[in-house]
């Protein structure tokens, strides 16, 4: 606390800061700042920052001294408390008549002039770097409010006397109350309690509207909008400088500031804070949202301008997109009404016109085409129907019956007894008693009240009935019969046939409960049988539609008990390859029994194999299944060395007999095609998706079909055809997902997004099933917001208009669903985002991307037209950077112009497509031509550029990549060497074809049979003699780990030959061979490497480039058939595979070592072969036991000088020291286990469980 003592010495203990005048305060601040200058202590930094506000703080508190004449504040006590605990609250105490500091440990009520101001939740706020967690309107807060306004206790009003808040309220009042602004002029805007209440009310309405989250796309952008300049700290007298204080701001800028301010408010947890005075929410929201912090946060002016420009562009583009969306929705509705009321003939004709090549997608053109195709009476019919759809929704929206609140309480109740009481109140409103077949209607309003199954469900829950009991009793409301459908494996969930709500779940275990003989002893085997049976369906041909899951379930039930009865099968949770092979055999035997049974009993479903006739002999099927089994499961069979083809055939025969003996003739029941097809379609997620959307937009009734006629109408509306028509088309099964609505998939996605948002709200508000939110309320909300942006002074009228469309969910909840309305769309194109499954590629003419010269369009010129015809000029074309400077609200964006070809965007369909294609083809030809001659010269060799021009062929460097700046030079050079280019290109292609294509000889010779491999030990002896080592060392490659090197040289302690294809020795030797071959190929093809291995580059550094290219010709290819032979031996004979790899390594070494010509290659290839093989052997030696290896191979520096360098002593190499790098190296070694005690018990615990 030395800093406190220093300050106390300066200030003098007991000094009352309220007794100091302004000059004394400034001198005191300067003295303290100079004393603490250069201090890095965070508390001192906070204190220095806080001293900026000391004078204003004292002046504000001194203003309150008139009411509290004995008010005092000891400076030392204040500073000491500030340093100890920065989270403080200075408060005024009437009893002690002093200003004191206390920690903010509980909710405070700040008392000033007898007025209680209750304070909301804690919000951190930063005042010039001093972080205070203020829970009350402290003197600091009021002092800060003094900068942007004054709080007058006499009237409890908010007077805009401060410059910043004056301008802000002017802006805000411009938006919400134009009349008040004109009436009060440029003086004080809000002076009375009545004005404050009116002002606050307007603010709350606007705040609720934006708080709902529907315009987050704009608010997030505006979050970057900081409207105040950087604070000039050198001038302590002027604290805040506002942009709007000295400039005349356009209405659009004012609107952005309002929305930005509301964005700050939207971070709060509740709309209305707790307060005792009912007209103070604005002050609390200003405080809680941290708006003061925003004012004090310095922002660079350049960033401000960039943010403003970008925001203006986004707002302009958004206006265009919103208008497009509004017109598109109307056009879609018109189109659907036309299809339903007039017929599909005219709608199909319109669709053909709209999808013509070169036609721009314009919703206005859809409306025009629809009206044009109809007569006067038909047009009136469509318009009238469109208005009727709106009115139907308005009736539901205006419903304010008391039963809505009761249903909400019923579905959101937390206790069953409480819900039961509410149910009794609802039953009084039933129009009919004991109704169990349809909705219970409200006798007061006539709308749907409650589904009967919900009534029964509440009673069962209150009686604490079991889940099985509830499921059984609720089944009478199910639209699907459990007994008829349970064995087909199709139905897993049951839904109410009245309201569509889910009743119960039926999972897989419910339908296969009879498989309890074995239980879950081997769930892995059960899953294996099920999966392999499903795979077998790929080659099985069923005569009619079947449920393949049911087919697999039966296979599990049939095969699993028989497999467990086999004596030599382990009854363990982990199954070995033998168990898997038995499972495959029994699966194929089950398939054979189905085929055999279908031949014997014609009532069974015909089952055969793809490509085979149904009446084929049983032997033919057996042959096919055996071949299929041995091919597809060769990996399992190869792991079992004792398994032969005869063994598989014998067990397959036994399995077939057991299945026939246990099950007899077995077949799949022939199902009704109509029933199977309709069931699969109705349960398909895409059908449910399309039907849901069709209900939302009014194409089909909201309720589930009650009669066969309604069901057929729904099916035909969603799919586009009746079930009978579908069954007449055999290929339909592969095209289930072809819907009538597919051309309007984007619109469906929008409506579906609304639906799911509404569903979540429905659950939240108690599940009123009868009410659905229409498209209208969302379109109306956006229409309102657009009008608000365009005509802010009339916001009150628009808000009143919006009230007409507010439904029973409440305005805020309805708009909350709007949030996801456009989430899945690209805001720039208005179409589905490409990252979603809703995205579809649209066929566009090539002229929409390229102009007639083959250049891509650049839409960087904005074309604006005057809104008012009297405005001059009538049209303005500006670049993106000049939009803010030259465009005001008198102009609207009309089109975009390409800066390359100067065509308007809506005129791209008029470009000559053939010219575009020809130009693109020519551009591609030029690119290929000049890329070919980028470095090679058509005159031979490489280009010889001098002054950017090749002296041999005349090619200029600047036309290689730029074909447009000098078109004459480009064409002249191309025409001069086009023939040469064609010849060289064909020559290269012919050479490549000779390499890739083997030309058959005139006389076809039979391919020579590859002789079986036999081991040649002489190759190992010859290699060992050259290397001067024991042949046993070469034989031990891959098997030196943990063996003494002395034993290795003598051939003692060698492990037995490998018996598994996964033996690590096989992988080690194979890796050594691959490394040898890789490095050899690097040497052989070194001319093609930019950075070959370092030591290989050293071997050939003295060779010329031509000699390096010739290495590929003079050096032989030693790879041959190594990889193929090794893979075969590894599976069939692992021991031979190990010997083969070692022998191949020796053969490759000897082939290279014995090369004798050309002479300039001999030394290079011998050094390479010796280096490679020695490196492989030395790497293996590192794995042998310590003490048996000569570490001198690493050089003398590795061995400690003066120590015994014996090959048999481990102390021959130095251990890490105790200081410096030795310790660091030891700590950083990731493989060091010196200090780890690994016992056998630990290793046992690490074994897989």
Swiss-Prot record:
SS bonds (residue pairs): none
BP terms from Gene Ontology: symbiont-mediated suppression of host cytoplasmic pattern recognition receptor signaling pathway via inhibition of IRF3 activity
Predominant location: virion
Entry keywords, A to Z: Host cytoplasm, Host-virus interaction, Inhibition of host innate immune response by virus, Inhibition of host IRF3 by virus, Inhibition of host RLR pathway by virus, Late protein, Viral immunoevasion, Virion
Gene Ontology terms: cellular component: host cell cytoplasm; virion component
Function: Together with the penton and the other minor capsid proteins (p17, p49), forms a complicated network immediately below the outer capsid shell, stabilizing the whole capsid. In addition, blocks IFN-beta transactivation mediated by the cGAS-STING pathway and regulates the transcriptional activity of IFN-beta. Mechanistically, suppresses the phosphorylation of host key adapter protein TBK1 and degrades host IRF3 in the cytoplasm.
Protein name: Minor capsid protein M1249L
Species this chain originates from: African swine fever virus (isolate Tick/Malawi/Lil 20-1/1983)
């Amino acid at each position: 606390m030395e800093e406190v003592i220093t300050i106390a010495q300066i200030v003098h203990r007991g000094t009352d800061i309220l007794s100091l005048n302004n000059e004394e305060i400034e001198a005191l601040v300067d003295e303290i700042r100079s004393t603490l200058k250069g201090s890095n202590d965070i508390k001192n930094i906070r204190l220095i920052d806080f001293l900026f506000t000391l004078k204003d703080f004292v002046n504000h508190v001194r203003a309150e001294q008139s009411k509290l004449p004995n008010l005092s504040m000891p400076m030392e006590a204040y500073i000491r408390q500030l340093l100890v605990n920065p989270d403080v609250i200075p408060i005024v105490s009437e009893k002690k008549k002093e200003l004191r500091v206390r920690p903010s440990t509980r909710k405070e009520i700040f008392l000033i002039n007898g007025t209680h101001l209750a304070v909301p939740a804690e919000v951190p706020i930063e005042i010039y770097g001093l972080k205070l967690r203020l829970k009350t309107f402290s003197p600091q807060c009021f002092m800060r409010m003094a900068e942007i306004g004054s709080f007058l206790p006499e009237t409890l009003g908010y007077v805009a006397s401060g410059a910043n808040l004056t301008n802000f309220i002017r802006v805000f009042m411009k938006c919400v109350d134009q009349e008040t602004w004109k009436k009060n002029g440029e003086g004080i805007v809000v002076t009375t309690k009545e004005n404050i209440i009116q002002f606050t009310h307007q603010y709350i309405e606007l705040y609720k509207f934006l708080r709902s989250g529907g315009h987050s796309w704009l608010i997030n952008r505006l979050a970057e909008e900081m409207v105040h300049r950087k604070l000039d700290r050198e001038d302590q007298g002027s604290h805040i400088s506002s942009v709007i204080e000295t400039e005349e701001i356009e209405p659009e800028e004012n609107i952005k500031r309002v929305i930005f301010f509301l964005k700050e408010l939207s971070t709060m947890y509740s709309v209305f804070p707790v307060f005792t005075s009912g007209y103070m929410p604005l002050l609390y929201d200003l405080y809680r949202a941290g708006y003061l912090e925003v004012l004090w946060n310095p922002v660079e002016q350049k960033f401000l301008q960039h943010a403003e420009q970008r925001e203006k562009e986004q707002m302009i583009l958004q206006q265009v997109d919103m208008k497009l969306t509004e017109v598109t929705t109307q056009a879609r509705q018109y189109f659907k009404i036309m299809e339903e009321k007039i017929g599909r003939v005219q709608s199909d004709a319109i669709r053909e016109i709209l999808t013509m090549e070169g036609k721009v997608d314009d919703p206005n053109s859809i409306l025009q085409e629809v009206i044009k195709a109809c007569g006067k009476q038909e047009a009136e019919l469509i318009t009238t129907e469109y208005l009727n759809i709106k009115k139907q929704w308005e009736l539901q929206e205006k419903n304010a019956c008391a039963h809505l609140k009761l249903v909400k309480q019923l579905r959101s109740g937390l206790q069953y007894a409480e819900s039961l009481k509410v149910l009794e109140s609802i039953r009084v409103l039933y129009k009919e008693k004991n109704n169990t077949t349809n909705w219970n209607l409200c006798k007061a309003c006539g709308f749907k009240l409650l589904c009967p199954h919900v009534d029964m469900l509440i009673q069962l829950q209150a009686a604490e009935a079991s889940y099985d009991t509830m499921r059984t009793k609720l089944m009478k409301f199910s639209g699907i019969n459990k007994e008829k459908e349970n064995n087909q494996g199709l139905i897993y969930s049951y839904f109410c046939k009245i309201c569509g709500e889910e009743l119960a779940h039926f999972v897989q275990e419910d339908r296969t409960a009879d498989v309890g003989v074995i239980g879950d002893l081997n769930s892995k085997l059960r899953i294996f049988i099920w999966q392999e049976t499903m795979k077998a369906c790929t080659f099985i041909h069923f005569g009619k539609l079947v449920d393949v899951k049911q087919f697999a379930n039966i296979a599990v039930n049939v095969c699993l008990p028989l497999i467990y009865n086999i004596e030599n099968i382990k009854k363990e949770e982990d199954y070995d390859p033998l168990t898997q092979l038995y499972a495959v055999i029994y699966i194929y035997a089950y398939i054979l029994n189905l085929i055999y049974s279908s031949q014997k009993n014609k009532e069974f479903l015909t089952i055969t194999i793809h490509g085979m006739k149904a009446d084929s002999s049983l032997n033919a099927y057996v042959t096919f299944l055996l071949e299929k089994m041995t091919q597809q499961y060769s990996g399992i069979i190869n792991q079992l060395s004792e398994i032969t083809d005869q063994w598989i055939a014998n067990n397959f025969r036994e399995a077939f007999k057991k299945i026939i003996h246990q099950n007899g003739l077995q077949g799949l029941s022939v199902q009704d095609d109509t029933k199977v097809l309709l069931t699969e379609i109705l349960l398909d997620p895409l059908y449910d998706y399309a039907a849901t959307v069709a209900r939302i937009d009014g194409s089909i009734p909201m309720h589930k079909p009650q009669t066969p006629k309604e069901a057929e109408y729904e099916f035909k509306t969603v799919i586009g055809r009746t079930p009978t028509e579908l069954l007449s088309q055999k290929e339909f099964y592969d095209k289930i997902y072809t819907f009538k609505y597919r051309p309007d998939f984007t619109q469906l996605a929008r409506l579906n997004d609304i639906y799911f948002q509404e569903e979540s709200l429905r659950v939240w508000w108690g599940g009123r099933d009868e009410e659905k939110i229409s498209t209208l309320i969302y379109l109306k909300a956006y229409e309102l917001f657009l009008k608000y942006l365009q005509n802010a002074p009339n916001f009150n009228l628009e808000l009143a208009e919006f009230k007409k469309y507010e439904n029973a969910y409440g305005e805020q909840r309805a708009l909350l669903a709007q949030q996801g309305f456009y989430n899945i769309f690209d805001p720039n194109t208005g179409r589905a985002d490409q990252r979603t499954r809703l995205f579809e590629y649209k066929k566009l003419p090539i002229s929409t991307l390229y102009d007639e010269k083959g250049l891509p369009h650049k839409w960087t010129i904005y074309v604006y037209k005057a809104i008012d015809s009297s405005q001059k000029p009538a049209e303005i074309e500006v670049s993106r950077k000049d939009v803010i400077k030259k465009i005001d609200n008198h102009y609207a964006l009309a089109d975009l112009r390409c800066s390359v070809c100067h065509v308007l965007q809506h005129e791209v369909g008029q470009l000559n497509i053939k010219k575009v294609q020809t130009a693109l083809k020519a551009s591609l030809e030029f690119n290929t031509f000049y890329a070919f001659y980028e470095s090679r010269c058509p005159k031979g060799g490489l280009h010889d550029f001098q002054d950017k021009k090749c002296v041999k062929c005349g090619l200029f460097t600047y036309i290689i990549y730029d074909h447009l700046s000098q078109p004459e030079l480009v064409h002249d050079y191309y025409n001069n060497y086009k023939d040469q280019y064609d010849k060289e290109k064909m020559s290269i292609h012919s050479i490549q074809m000779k390499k890739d294509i083997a030309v058959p000889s005139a006389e076809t010779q039979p391919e020579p049979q590859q002789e079986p491999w036999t081991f040649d030990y002489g190759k190992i002896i010859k290699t060992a003699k050259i290397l001067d080592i024991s042949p046993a060392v070469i034989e031990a490659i891959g098997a030196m780990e943990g063996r003494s090197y002395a034993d290795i040289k003598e051939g003692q302690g060698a492990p037995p030959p490998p018996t598994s294809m996964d033996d690590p020795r096989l992988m080690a030797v194979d890796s050594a061979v691959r490394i040898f071959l890789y490095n050899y190929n690097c040497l052989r093809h070194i001319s093609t490497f930019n950075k070959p291995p370092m030591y290989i580059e050293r071997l050939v550094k003295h060779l010329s480039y031509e000699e390096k290219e010739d290495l590929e010709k003079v050096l032989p290819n030693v790879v041959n058939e190594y990889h193929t032979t090794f893979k075969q031996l590894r599976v069939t004979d692992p021991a031979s595979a190990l010997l083969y790899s070692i022998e191949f390594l020796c053969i490759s070494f000897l082939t290279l070592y014995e090369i004798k010509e050309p002479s300039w290659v001999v030394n290079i290839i011998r050094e390479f072969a010796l280096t490679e093989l020695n490196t492989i052997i030395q790497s293996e030696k590192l794995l042998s036991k310590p003490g048996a290896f000569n570490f001198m191979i690493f050089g003398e520096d590795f061995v400690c000088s003066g120590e015994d360098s014996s090959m048999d002593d481990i102390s021959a190499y130095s251990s890490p020291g105790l200081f410096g790098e030795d310790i660091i190296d030891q700590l950083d070694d990731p493989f060091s286990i010196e200090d780890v005690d690994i016992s056998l018990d630990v290793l046992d615990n690490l074994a897989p469980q």
